[in-house]
Amino acid sequence: MKKLFISVLVVLCSITSMDAQKFNVSGSIETHASYLWRGSKECGTHVVPCLSLGYGNLTLQSYGFISFDGDYKEIDWDLSYSVGEFSFHLADYYARLSSYTTPENYFSFRKGETNHIQEAIICYEPQKLPFAIRWFTFVHGDWLPQDDGTLGRASFSSYLEPEIYHMFTPNSRLSLFCGASIFKGGYTSYTRDFAIINLELRYRHHLDFDHFRIPLQISYMINPYRKTSWLSAGVGIEF
């Protein structure tokens, strides 16, 4: 865990060696009927605030998912660095349900206590092809359950997601995702090394105005492994 944070610190410190550039700051607020994530429904109607700070090829984002009924909240951080058609991310996810009986401690990262999960992400999206592929691996916060009820080693649960898409206009994108669980992880209750867990069709359109944009989105998701499906829609504002 310490090595992970040291690596993040090194990346942040590297900003000082970059050529003088302006910081880019942006924000958005969206609301969706359901929070659909990697073949599962995390909560119902919710709001998603997001703040993004960019400098050169570095981007730091903070965003959350807060359900209207107060049952679910999630606070996420994502630090990314872009090189050509690749981007590399370190992310931290913090999620809690109101039904949790343990006291909340945002600053705990101990096994069996933390509600944080850290993830390493690699994305490839060629500019000349309507295709993208992303690899996600939990590096801390997700452990393999043992037969005696204790937690074992880190699961390194991974998720592979290819995407093909069509741009009707620069503001209209239709995407088809196929997500797979790689290695035993929570996506399959730690029972399968491989499973298709997410088939999603998503359409997203932006309405442009002088100083802001309004995103509109509709998604249909199927989880072949769980034999479940959901439909969701959302709207927001970007500034």
Task: Identify the role of each PLM range.
Residues 1-24:
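Cleavable N-terminal export/targeting peptides
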Residues 21-54:
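Outer-membrane beta-barrel initiation region
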Residues 21-24, 89, 128-130, 166-174, ...:
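Short loop/turn motifs that connect adjacent beta-strands in outer-membrane beta-barrel proteins
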Residues 23-25, 43-47, 71-75, 114-120, ...:
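Residues that define the transmembrane beta-barrel architecture of outer-membrane proteins
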Residues 28-35, 57-68, 88-96, 103-105, ...:
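Transmembrane beta-strand segments that form the barrel wall of outer-membrane beta-barrel proteins
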Residues 108-185:
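Detector for outer-membrane/organellar transmembrane beta-barrel domains
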Residues 175-209:
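Outer membrane beta-barrel transmembrane domains
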Residues 201, 205-207, 227-239:
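Outer-membrane beta-barrel "beta-signal"
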